[in-house]
Amino acid sequence: MAAPWLQRWRGAYAGPSGPLRLVRLHGVQRSSWRAAHAAAGAFGAGPHPGPPQRAANPGPGPHPPPVATSREKHARIVQGRPDQPAEPKVLRISIIGAPNSGKSTLSNQLLGRKVFPVSKKVHTTRCKARGVITHEDTQLIILDTPGLTSPMKAKRHKLEAAMLTDPWDSMKHADLVLVLVDVSDHWTRNSLSLEVLKCLSQFPHIPSVLVLNKVDLLKKKIILLGLINELTEGIVNGKKLKVRSEFEYNSSSPAKTVLKVTQTPPPENRARESPCQLETDKAQEGSSLDNSSDVKASESSLDTEAREQKPYKYGDQKNRKGWPHFQDIFMLAALNGEEVDTLKQYLLMQAKPGPWEFHSRVLTSQSPHEICDNIIREKILEYLPLEVPYGVTQVTELWEEGPSGELIIVQNLVVPRKSHKLMLIGRRGALISRIAQEAGQDLMNIFLCDIRLKLKVEVKS
């Protein structure tokens, strides 16, 4: 049962659709679809369209389609005429953020299948690619792009010119932009990067949503209050955020942190006051307070009130940390897919009437050869140290269907030095075998067929 103060708060801000819903990001008893919907922690996401149909893949709808193994067949499907429904809807989504913030991981989770490379090293994504989600009459087109970086960093890492221009090009075609911030990175989480701010200020007319990633890795959830205030400049959906905090500690409370978020009214009611609240129940292990100290619940809240916004001038980014024009905020956990389900539902609701770009059988615009190269390079980036993986050149020698329907792939990995070759092969061939095994498994999950992958290593002559 909710605390008396919370009951009063919810009653005071009850809208036409009833009291505002309480969201628990962790520790929630998911006895209803409303609780599952609430888990993403969206500010102002509006009403949920209904209980999501659970499947093996994240989000609604059937399993995502496989990618054709033949380059020609895949090209025919991608370039073919879309099977338009009677009233099609579409939404083009650009996901931007600093390098290694989790953009490709989020794209894969939304798609329900891993088609984009993911690595702990920066600049894993080298060029823009599109992922396609088709659900009933709605098509979401995800524009997965390289992390926004500066020309100086691009020169230092010897990056292709496309890695500088692709994120900006994707914004030109986007209907909505997701700005991803890794809140577990204490070096970068307190402000949006200069490149992200430049990109947002260049396209201020495109609706933007702030996505805080890996919130489950924060030991102190109260940090989120300060981060939200910094990254939004205290404004969400045109409303000023007021933060009020009272912290008292209870030695008998559970030794875990629970974040609860109250959702704003649906979009059609946003003309009225639309409060959103964060309540943090926090028990601090190893606290300097004596264990016999009095116990009370901790509470924090974010209220909103209308205010006139100052225009955001292009060129002011150096003096700013955040973006005051986000229309919503989502919080995602690193290891939980339910929050991604809710984000996908939100994106489906944002789609507008318009023709589809792709046939419903399309999962990605990447060719099967590009997917293969990216998956193998992901493993190379993961297992080789420092700059070594960036010097590997991939050459596919064989790509054919075997007698039993399996896909046979032979790829040559060319390295600049003999020492790099020894590193890549590993002791008694252990590392190259591991890379081939893991990459082969990922390719099987993408193409939905047996894969025989052979990797060879040679020194560049």
From Swiss-Prot:
**Membrane topology recorded in Swiss-Prot or TrEMBL:** Peripheral membrane protein
The residue ranges flagged as biased composition, category Basic and acidic residues, are 269-284, 304-319
Q: Which residues does the annotated region (G5) include?
A: 332-334
Localisation per UniProt entry? Mitochondrion matrix; Mitochondrion inner membrane
Q: Which gene encodes it?
A: ERAL1
Q: According to the UniProt record, where is the region Disordered?
A: 39-73, 260-319
KH type-2 domain span: 380-461
- A GO term (biological process) for this protein? ribosomal small subunit assembly
Per UniProt, GTP binds at: 97-104, 144-148, 213-216
Q: What is this protein called?
A: GTPase Era, mitochondrial
Q: Which residues form the Era-type G domain?
A: 89-354
Family membership noted in the UniProt record? Belongs to the TRAFAC class TrmE-Era-EngA-EngB-Septin-like GTPase superfamily. Era GTPase family.
What are the annotated GO cellular component locations? Answer: mitochondrial inner membrane; mitochondrial matrix
Q: Does the keyword Transmembrane helix apply?
A: no
**What ranges does the record give for the region G4, renumbered to this chain?**
213-216
Q: Could you tell me which residues belong to the region G2?
A: 123-127
